[in-house]
From Swiss-Prot:
Top EC category: translocase
The enzyme's E.C. designation: 7.4.2.6
GO cellular component: plasma membrane
Listed name of the protein: Oligopeptide transport ATP-binding protein OppF
SMART domains referenced in this protein's UniProt entry, alphabetically: AAA
Catalyzed chemical reaction(s): a [peptide](out) + ATP + H2O = a [peptide](in) + ADP + phosphate + H(+)
Recorded GO MF terms: ATP binding; ATP hydrolysis activity
Keyword terms: ATP-binding, Cell membrane, Membrane, Nucleotide-binding, Peptide transport, Protein transport, Translocase, Transport
Originating gene: oppF
Listed PROSITE patterns: ABC_TRANSPORTER_1, ABC_TRANSPORTER_2
Similarity annotation: Belongs to the ABC transporter superfamily.
Subunit and partners: The complex is composed of two ATP-binding proteins (OppD and OppF), two transmembrane proteins (OppB and OppC) and a solute-binding protein (OppA).
């Protein structure tokens, strides 16, 4: 598979100002030197706790946040430059599904106009072609035709998210950034929305950057995974690399927090969580610099990278 988007040394800093003259005295390193590659038709998971910088990366990719430095390489060119972004029709090819579907939908517009908006922004087609396209999109996400004349408040959370998905795929994008797309939904509704996303990917060949804190969902949805902590990637690899052979103490910490429905192993799981948490506290100084930032990534295999101490002392899988 060929590359669709390549992030090179991406940095997003927010200045901290203080004093009478409101001078910049420090920076919040929301994203600090991230490298990430997304290939055509694949789903890359970006996971981490709140404040790790994962959503900032997603917003930077679609242009909702401004990067401090680095490169966004799309079709071999740096689309951080606005002129090149427009030439390559980047904003048409890269769309986003938001966490809060209701807030992302204009309450004054009908569903027809909401789905039609990106088509009208990027394509010049006649009314009949537009109408046909919108009805096709509605069928894809499983909503009835009468929904087109209704407004966002008339739908449930799951239906609103499906409307958001229909809007995202309206321009036939190459990549969709999905930022916590199901975190606000009930479990039964989550499954419906996730299955729609997988079906759309299979039918249309769209690549996804799937941003989430829920490792169970990420395991179900993704091919490759990057784990973020404090603005940096601490480990990345295939789904098997991350779930079966985790190497970084933070990755192990996240995995140990996944709830289990097996009540017979509840005591064992709790004991393991406490062990992993203690291991994290004991070894933290070896895996992070004095400012709390992860060390540079080391290549462990063709698909697996982790931010390990010098000498790779933690290359083991005792999770």
């Amino acid at each position: 598979m060929s590359e669709i988007l390549n992030l090179k040394d991406l940095k997003v800093y927010y200045p901290i100002r203080s004093g009478f003259f409101n001078r910049v005295t420090d920076n919040v390193l929301a994203v600090d030197g991230v490298d990430l590659t997304i290939h055509e038709g694949e789903t890359v998971g970006l996971v981490g706790e709140s404040g790790s910088g994962k959503s900032t990366i997603g917003k930077t990719i679609v242009g909702l946040e401004q990067m401090t430095s680095g490169q966004l390489i799309y079709k071999g060119q740096d689309v951080s430059k606005k002129k090149i972004r427009n030439q390559l029709k980047y904003n048409k090819d890269v769309q986003m599904i938001f966490q809060d579907a209701f807030s992302s939908l204009n309450p004054r517009k009908t569903i027809y106009d909401i789905i039609a908006e990106p088509i009208r922004n990027f394509e010049k087609i006649d009314a009949n072609t537009e109408n046909k396209r919108i009805h096709e999109l509605l069928d894809i996400v499983g909503l009835p035709k009468q929904a087109l004349e209704q407004y966002p408040f008339q739908f449930s959370g799951g239906q609103q998210q499906r409307i958001g998905i229909a809007r995202a795929v309206a321009t036939n994008p190459k990549l969709i950034v999905a930022d916590e797309p199901v975190s606000a939904l009930d479990l039964s509704v989550q499954a419906q929305v996730l299955n729609f996303m997988k079906l759309i990917q299979k039918d249309l060949g769209i690549a996804f950057l799937f941003i989430s804190h829920d490792l169970g969902v990420v395991r179900h949805m993704t091919d490759n995974i990057a784990v973020m902590h404090n603005g940096r990637i601490v480990e990345k690899g295939t789904r098997r690399d991350i779930f079966d052979e985790p190497q970084h103490i933070y990755t192990k910490r996240l995995l140990s927090a996944i709830p289990s429905i097996d009540v017979t192993r509840r005591a064992e799981n709790r004991k393991n969580r406490l062990k992993v948490e203690q291991d994290f506290e004991d070894k933290k100084a070896n895996f992070y610099d004095k400012d709390g930032h992860a060390l540079p990534l080391k290549k462990l295999s063709e698909s697996h990278w982790a931010a390990l101490p010098k000498g790779g002392e933690n290359v083991e899988s005792n999770y």
